[in-house]
UniProtKB/Swiss-Prot annotation:
The active site is at residues 72, 147, 171. It comes from Methylacidiphilum infernorum (isolate V4) (Methylokorus infernorum (strain V4)). The keyword Chloroplast does not apply. GO terms for molecular function: ATP binding; glutaminyl-tRNA synthase (glutamine-hydrolyzing) activity. It catalyses: L-glutamyl-tRNA(Gln) + L-glutamine + ATP + H2O = L-glutaminyl-tRNA(Gln) + L-glutamate + ADP + phosphate + H(+). The keyword Ribosomal protein does not apply. GO terms for cellular component: glutamyl-tRNA(Gln) amidotransferase complex. Its EC number is 6.3.5.7. This is Glutamyl-tRNA(Gln) amidotransferase subunit A. Keywords: ATP-binding, Ligase, Nucleotide-binding, Protein biosynthesis. InterPro entries: Amidase, Amidase_CS, Amidase_dom, AS_sf, GatA. Allows the formation of correctly charged Gln-tRNA(Gln) through the transamidation of misacylated Glu-tRNA(Gln) in organisms which lack glutaminyl-tRNA synthetase. The reaction takes place in the presence of glutamine and ATP through an activated gamma-phospho-Glu-tRNA(Gln). One of its GO terms (biological process) is translation. HAMAP family: GatA (MF_00120).
Amino acid sequence: MKLFELSVKELRRLLVQKEVSPLEVVENLLCRIAEVDPKIFAYIYLNHERALEASKKADISLPLGGVPVAIKDNINVLGEPCRCASRILEGYLAPYDSTVIEKLKKAGAILLGRTNMDEFAMGSSTENSSVGITRNPWNTERVPGGSSGGSAAAVAAHEAFCALGSDTGGSIRQPAAFCGCVGLKPTYGRVSRYGLTAFASSLDQIGPITKTVEDAALLLEVISGFDPFDNTSEKLPVPRFSELLENRPLKDFVLGIPKEYFIEGIDGEVRQALSQVIGHYEKLGVKIEEVSLPHTPYAVATYYILATAEASANLARFDGIRYGKRAKNYNDLIDYYGKTRDEGFGSEVKRRILLGTYVLSSGYYDAYYLRALKVKEKIKQDFSLAFQKCQALLTPTSPFCAFRIGEKTSDPLQMYLADIFTIAVNLAGICALSIPCGRSTEGLPIGFQLIGPAWKEETILALGYIYQKTTGWVPPLPPLGGPTGGGGADGLPL
C-alpha cells in the first residue's frame, strides 16, 4: 500500500513511530495531486509553500499532528482565497480563521488546499462551480455529488487523507456516497459555524469526509465544541468519539427502517445493496424494526422553501462594494447592484435567491414560509417518535448512484431529488453518517445512511465502525477514468 492510500489512523501510527516524516507525507500527497487532479479537478487552490513549511514544524504528539487536511472553499482560512466557487468573491482573501480551522491547527493538522464545490453550496453535483466541474474518480464522466464534491473526490482519489465539507441538505453525505467515502453530518450546534460562509444558517453544519469511520470519529472529536462566536453552538462536553467505537453491545440494539425511504424509484442495485447491509446487521445480532416517518414526503418542498428564504437574506450581503467582483458599467446604485449580482452569481444561485425572495414576500409569507416552519417541526417530531422505538435508523443515502455530467442540469427538480433521503436530517437538526456498502455493475459506489438522535453521534459512529470492521473494509483505489466493469462490494458481495 502506498503512503497516500493510508487512512488517518494508519498515517498517524507511522508518524508517531517515526517511520515517515510530515514533510515526506506532504511531498508524497502533492505528487499524487499533481498526477491525479488534472483528471478530476478536486482542488481549486493549493498552498504548496504553506503546507511544506507547516510540515517541517508539525508536532507529532498532537491528535492530528502531521496530517494534511483538505478544506471546502466556503470555510475561511486566514490569508487564503474563500470564493465559495463564485465569481462574485473573486479576489477575496479570508481575514480570519474559522473556528474549525483554529481547532485543526491546534490539533496539529496541516492545511493542504481548498476543494471545489457548488457555488455557495447550492447544488448536488459540483456542476454549479464558476471555476470548473469536478469529476467522479470512479468514472470521470459522472458527477462526484455536491455540494462538497471536491472534498469527496479528493478523499476518494487519495488526494487527501481527509477533508472538511458542509452539509445543508445532504452536501457531505450524498457526495460521500457517490464517491465511496465516509461522510458525517453532525448534530446542529455540535460544530461551530463561525467562519463558514452561510447558505441557510438554520440548516448548515460543518463535518468530515474521510476514508473510514474511525477517521470520521477522530476528526469530529477535534472540530466539535462550544464556540461563543456562534450563538447556535451548544455548550456540551465533547465525547471521546474515537474511543467509543469498540465494544458496543448489539444484543438489544434496535435499528429502525423507515418505510418512507424504501419507495418506488430507488435504483435496483441500491436497493439490493441496502438489503445486504440490513442482513449483515441482523447476523451481528441487531434487531431490525420497520418505523414510519409520515411527513417525509413533504421534506423536499419544506427544505426548498426554508433554505432559499435564508439564502436570499444571507446572499444580500454580497454586492461587490467592499470586496469581490463588481460591475464596471452602470447608471446608478440600483443598476450597479443588479449588474454586479447578475455578473457575479451563477444561474442556480439566482434561481434560489428568486425563490427565497418570493416565499418571503408579503403576499406569500404565511402561505409558504410559515407553513414550511410548521412542517419542519412535524418532521422533527417524526424522528423523535421513531427514536422511542429504536436507537438509530438505516436508509439509502441516495436513491441512485452518481449520474452523468450534464444529465440533470436542465431539470432542477430532478437535481433536487438527489437529496431526497438526506434533507429531512437537516430539517430535524439531528446527526447522520453515510458509509460505502458496495459498487454497482458499472463500478459506481453505493452508500447507506445511519441516522441518530441529536447528540448521539457516538451511536451511529459505533454502528458504522462495526460494519466496516466486520466486512473487512479497505478504502479502494478508484480507476480515475471512464466507465469500468463493476459488481461486488468492498467487503460484501452484491
